[in-house]
Structures are given as C-alpha cells and as structure tokens.
A protein has these predicted regions:
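Residue-level recognition of tetratricopeptide repeat
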Residues: 56, 90, 127, 143-145
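TPR-adjacent "capping" and linker segments in tetratricopeptide-repeat scaffold/adaptor proteins
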Residues: 8-25, 99-109
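Structural motif corresponding to the intra-repeat A-B loop/turn of tetratricopeptide repeats
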Residues: 36, 70, 124, 158-159
Length: 161
C-alpha cells in the first residue's frame, strides 16, 4: 500500500494494492452475502481473498466485523489490528503525511478498521490500548468523524491493558 497526495486539496489518501483494487466486486458480493445472512460463505470468500491478497484492508475489516457480531473480540482485534498496522506502515514509509481525511474513499477501510479495533479492545477490557489507538488515529484526521476519541473515553468498565 502506498500514499498519494490529493491534487484537489492538501490531503493524502491510501492507494491500495493492485490485488485489492481488482477485487472490489468480490467485496460487494461478500457484503450482499452478509446482508442475506450467508455469513459462513462470506467468511470463506474473505479468507480466500486474503490468501490471494494479504494486504487487503477491506477484507480484514469485513472479517473483523463478522468476528465482532459473533462475539469474538480476540479474532476481531486480530483482523482490525492487521488492517491498522498495514495503514500505519504505509504512512511511515511515506514519511507520516497529514492530513489523512476519512472523507477520501481510499482512507475509509483504515479508519473503519481502527474503529473496530477500538471496539474490540474495549470489549477485551483493554481501555488503555483503545484510548492510545484512538488518539493515534484521530491525529490523522482531527475532525475524528467516527468519534474514536469519544468512543474510547466513554467506555466505563474493564481492566486496563
């Protein structure tokens, strides 16, 4: 994954790997499967997509969401965490450019995975890690349109980890 500046405004956007860009229709099919309640088939398709394209953020995001719905925050944390890690790695390689607005389509899977990661961390009782993650991600888009800081700060229970 690489970073490209926007020509329209001073902002940056993730450019996803070619293998991920070629599989956008597959993700649309997976979303339709999930809406139809065919989560097992959707999961198998997502696992296959990751076997073909390990850096496919959208596939990690969808698997993380499925894991959260199935009350498996540990698995969700793994998928969301991998997507967030890939995003931060690309940012570091590009010299940590900013801003990185959620409003750009290429950035949405990263931010949505970060929100999922915060949820999974909170469900696992890791409020400190959730807050650290929220702060790090919110710094990329100070508008914090997904409310990561509010989400991480509002959770009242759980151990710190």
């Amino acid at each position: 994954m690489v970073m490209l500046p926007s020509l329209a405004a001073p902002a940056w956007e993730f450019v996803h790997p070619r293998c991920a860009r070629r599989r956008r229709e597959d993700i649309a099919e997976v979303e339709a499967m999930i809406e139809a309640g065919e989560t097992e088939i959707a999961r198998e398709e997502l696992v296959w997509l990751l076997s073909e394209c390990p850096d496919f953020l959208e596939a990690h995001l969808q698997l993380g969401l499925l894991a959260l719905e199935e009350d498996d925050p540990k698995l969700a944390r793994g998928h969301f965490g991998r997507a967030v890690e890939l995003g931060f790695r690309a940012l570091e390689t590009a010299g940590n450019p900013r801003p990185l607005p959620y409003s750009r389509p290429g950035n949405r899977p990263f931010f949505e995975s970060a929100k999922g990661l915060v949820h999974a961390l909170l469900e696992s009782g890791r409020k400190g890690m959730a807050l650290d993650t929220a702060k790090k991600v919110a710094a990329l888009d100070p508008v914090d349109p997904l409310g990561l800081l509010r989400l991480a700060a509002a959770d009242g229970g759980g151990k710190d980890g």
